[in-house]
Amino acid sequence: METQRASLSLGRCSLWLLLLGLALPSASAQVLSYREAVLRAVDQLNEQSSEPNIYRLLELDQPPQDDEDPDSPKRVSFRVKETVCPRTTQQPPEQCDFKENGLLKRCEGTVTLDQVRGNFDITCNNHQSIRITKQPWAPPQAARICRIIFLRVCR
């Protein structure tokens, strides 16, 4: 009789551990990674955009070293680039090629990592690319000054 109770108690304990083990992965699966949250924000940007083509994540700045609370807003900063895929496409942006000379946008704001109640507050601005033109060679400023002084002294 005593053995039967012990085995029944052990069975219940095992059942509780099994249920607890099954519940934990589903709770942690509710949290997005920093990158996943940004990709969701890019999807939302594409949904709200009136531009002909969709954008794809080009560059993601380092995640903040904040707390791990999925409900607290995390600062994000990233760049997106226009793709060749039209807005009407059913294809995920990651499968679209970047458009040659496509528009670049710099996006900043906050995201939450909670998968169910994820919030995005993102602002994107056109990102002007800086074109560096090669200037004709000229001697350093100090050399020009010395040359001017030398010419005036010699005349």
Swiss-Prot record:
Cystine connections: 85-96, 107-124, 146-154
Compartments, record wording: Secreted
Highest taxon of source: Eukaryota
GO annotations of cellular component type: extracellular space
Keywords: Antibiotic, Antimicrobial, Disulfide bond, Pyrrolidone carboxylic acid, Secreted, Signal
Modified residues (Pyrrolidone carboxylic acid): 30
Propeptide span(s): 30-143
Main subcellular localisation: secreted
Signal peptide: 1-29
InterPro entries membership: Cathelicidin-like, Cathelicidin_CS, Cystatin_sf
PROSITE patterns in UniProt: CATHELICIDINS_1, CATHELICIDINS_2
GO molecular function: lipopolysaccharide binding
GO BP, sorted A to Z: antimicrobial humoral immune response mediated by antimicrobial peptide; defense response to Gram-negative bacterium; defense response to Gram-positive bacterium; innate immune response
The family this protein is said to belong to: Belongs to the cathelicidin family.
Annotated function: Potent microbicidal activity; active against S.aureus and E.coli.
Protein name in UniProt: Cathelicidin-1
